[in-house]
């Protein structure tokens, strides 16, 4: 069974015509309506995190669709090693300001135009809901972060938010913003803003 982002169901035989090649694709039956397919596992992950993401985003003034896209990208729909072993669905590193548990994992980072694989410590949580709450607090957790992420937190639309997030240095991937926008548009996550 394959689910669409608006909760409509597409029959499995229809979905098999164009199996999800990457994070998600449309088939000829859903392309006309603009709906994008989610697998059952993706929908279960999405439904699990959505209420908490909405609550945190509203409380902290973060654009909801950006948070949702980041969970999809950073955790591979909750299936990444970091997500399954440390409940970290945003890829937040454990720097010197972090007092909690950490989890070390190999990750790809871009520096000086080159992609390298490095070992990094990431924050570890008891639940993914702790990860969501911590993400909401992260951007104002130090005076430096409050200043650095101010434009991100002031953004009222997802395009501005991801642009400001990229400019702040949140991720080393030079096309991080493009990836987030692609997910937001592909899954119509902007409907939650």
Q: For each predicted feature, which ranges?
A:
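Catalytic cores of secreted/periplasmic lytic hydrolases that degrade extracellular macromolecules
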Residues: 1-193
């Amino acid at each position: 069974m394959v689910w669409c982002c608006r909760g409509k169901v597409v029959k499995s035989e229809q979905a098999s015509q164009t199996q999800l090649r990457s994070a998600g694709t449309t088939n000829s039956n859903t392309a006309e309506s603009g709906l994008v397919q989610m697998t059952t596992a993706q929908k279960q992950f999405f439904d699990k995190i959505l209420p908490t993401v909405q609550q945190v985003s509203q409380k902290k003034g973060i654009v909801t669709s950006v948070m949702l896209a980041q969970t999809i990208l950073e955790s591979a729909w909750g299936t990444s090693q970091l997500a399954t072993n440390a409940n970290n669905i945003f890829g937040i590193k454990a720097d010197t300001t972090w007092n909690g548990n950490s989890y070390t994992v190999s990750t790809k980072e871009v520096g000086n135009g080159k992609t390298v694989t490095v070992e990094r410590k990431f924050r570890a949580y008891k639940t993914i809901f702790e990860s969501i709450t911590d993400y909401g607090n992260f951007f104002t957790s130090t005076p430096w972060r409050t200043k650095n992420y101010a434009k991100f937190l002031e953004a009222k639309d997802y395009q501005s938010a991801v642009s400001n997030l990229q400019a702040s240095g949140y991720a080393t991937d030079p096309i991080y913003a493009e990836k987030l926008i692609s997910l937001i548009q592909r899954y119509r996550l902007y409907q939650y803003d």
